[in-house]
Amino acid sequence: MSMKMKGIYKGFKCISQIFAVEKERDEIEIGFPTDVKHVAHIGWEGSSGSAPGWMSEFKVGAELLSPRPSSFSNARPSTSFFTSSSSTDFDQGSSQRGISDTLRDIPPVTPINLPKNNKKKSSRRKKSSSSSSSPKSSRSSVLSKSSYKSTVSRLI
């Protein structure tokens, strides 16, 4: 009897969990589209146009930090890396630069000196003194004698 009650209890527990999950789904509130900030505006503190505190460590001109489009029309030349490198890239058209000019801008590559492995792997196995009486070693000794004769004949 206790087994039946345990089975019924587990059944009710599973069913109650299903309804509990359905109830939680109805309670989720989704905000309006105006509540979400655009990715470009994340980090700006209000409409003042000043950069957030965590960006104060970067030394970039103030005209680049301002989110207002009117500030770009009043931009003055800056000595920062971003404006100097981008202005040189856009001042010269890609059709005006030749391949040789592009290759001239690339620094030369120095080769890496790797240590050379002077040891060559031998395909022959070394003879052991204990296996000299076996038929295999006698065959290898015959082969080595023939190779010895051919080497000697080449030298003479």
UniProtKB/Swiss-Prot annotation:
Entry keywords, A to Z: Cytoplasm, Growth regulation
Keyword Transmembrane helix: no
Annotated Pfam families: PBD
Gene Ontology BP terms: pollen tube growth
Tissue expression summary: Expressed in roots, leaves, flowers and pollen.
Sequence ranges assigned to domain CRIB in this UniProt record: 30-43
InterPro entries from the UniProt entry: CRIB_dom, CRIB_dom_sf
Gene3D superfamilies: CRIB domain
Basic residues composition-biased segments: 117-128
Annotated compartments: Cytoplasm
Compositional bias of kind Low complexity: 78-96, 129-156
Biased composition (Polar residues): 68-77
Any one Gene Ontology cellular component term annotated for this protein: cytoplasm
Positions of region (Disordered): 68-156
Function: Functions as a downstream effector of Rho-related GTP binding proteins of the 'Rho of Plants' (ROPs) family. Participates in the propagation of ROP GTPase signals in specific cellular responses. Is involved in pollen tube growth regulation.
Note: Over-expression of RIC10 in tobacco germinating pollen increases pollen tube elongation.
Full protein name: CRIB domain-containing protein RIC10
Gene from which this protein is expressed: RIC10
